Amino acid sequence: MVPRPEQTPDALRAALAAVDPKRLPEMQRTKDEAFAKAVEWQSLSPVRSWVLTWARDIEIARRPDLAARHAHAKNNLEHEDADVAREALRELSAVLDEAMKAVHA
């Protein structure tokens, strides 16, 4: 398992390259957007949000248990059975919460 990266742009990028390299262009695009908003808003909150979002997503990708739960939940979000779709939404929320708590630990 890839170690949990520090919450810096370079460390997050290196970790993403190891666990989900196809998302690197998305990461760069959202980083550029966050930094542009930070300048426009004269606030670091868009940058902090970007860091936390990617730290959370990398946490999911680097942990097979979370990655499997995340994929299963996403695959069932639009299930024809409303109960299955609701459970998928609940599980997706639980996975995101667990990953966010882990990166705040």
Positions of the model-derived regions?
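General structural signal for secondary-structure boundaries
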Residues: 8-11, 59, 82, 89-91
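Generic amphipathic alpha-helical segments used as scaffolds and interaction surfaces in large
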Residues: 3, 14, 18, 38-41, ...
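Short terminal alpha-helical segments
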Residues: 1-36
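Amphipathic alpha-helical interaction modules
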Residues: 23-66
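Amphipathic alpha-helical binding modules
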Residues: 67-105
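Charge-rich, solvent-exposed alpha-helical interaction surfaces
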Residues: 15, 30, 34, 50, ...
